Amino acid sequence: LPDAASKEVMPLLRPDVKVLDTSTAFRTDAAWDYGFPELAGQKEKIKNSCRVAVPGCYASGFISIARPLVELGLAPAEYPFSCTGISGYSGGGKKMIAEYESADRPAHSKLDAPKSYGLGLAHKHLPEMQKISGLAHTPMFVPVVCDYYCGMQVLVPLDLTLAGSTAEQVAEGIAVYYKDAATVKVHALNEALPENGLYSNAMAGTDRMELYMTVNAAGDQMMLVSLFDNLGKGSSGAAVQCMNLMLGLEETKGLE
């Protein structure tokens, strides 16, 4: 449901009715549990919850990186976080899908090229990105949509001097943080990248997320990348995972 409809419906439901909401309406509401089971302590909260808000796609990628950094003390809450998100056009909803898939689309058009948007720095996922990550300030975020259907990567640069950590500490901390995660895989620091880079649609058709970490030769700059399907772990896959937990089913039942 759209945000307004979700807010209108909720007062009509009994408190003991289990609700899984996919809009942005309740993601920062203290009365709701955030639907990212891999965050520390979150799985048990979701299991026992009657109100779970499914994360936004871009937010999922950013939070998967920023939350552990702050929670583990690898970066301060005051750190000036920024990120870039690259997505297939399905991430823009029905209107954008129709635009990209229109039979009237010219053979060569502006849609062939990546498009940055949200340049007013007020993307609707920013409130949850800040709150769930435990940040003192709103992160700077620029999304980019490209001419392919689905798949997403979110890139978070980290100045290790400002963060007060080493690359090894960051890599070890994040690996331990997600060691028991059912749907998140952490790659080793500077692990050889497939095809010397990361294609944003590499995880398309899956409900999993993979995290990559690289560091420069000087050891003072890192790039952390969350790679997943915006329609999978960034949307319906996350919803199914949370539903399974709320209903007492196997966490990954029905997931790819």
Model regions and ranges:
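Residue-level signal for short, function-critical loop segments
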Residues: C57, L162, N230
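C-terminal substrate-binding/catalytic lobe of Rossmann-fold NAD(P)-dependent oxidoreductases
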Residues: P80, T84-G85, Y89-L224
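NAD(P)-dependent Rossmann-like dehydrogenase/reductase catalytic/cofactor-binding core
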Residues: R208-E256
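N-terminal Rossmann-like NAD(P) cofactor-binding subdomain of oxidoreductases
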Residues: L1-L111, Y117, T214-A217, K253
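Predominant activation on well-ordered alpha-helical scaffold segments within soluble catalytic domains
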Residues: I63-V70, L126-Q130, A175, Y212, ...
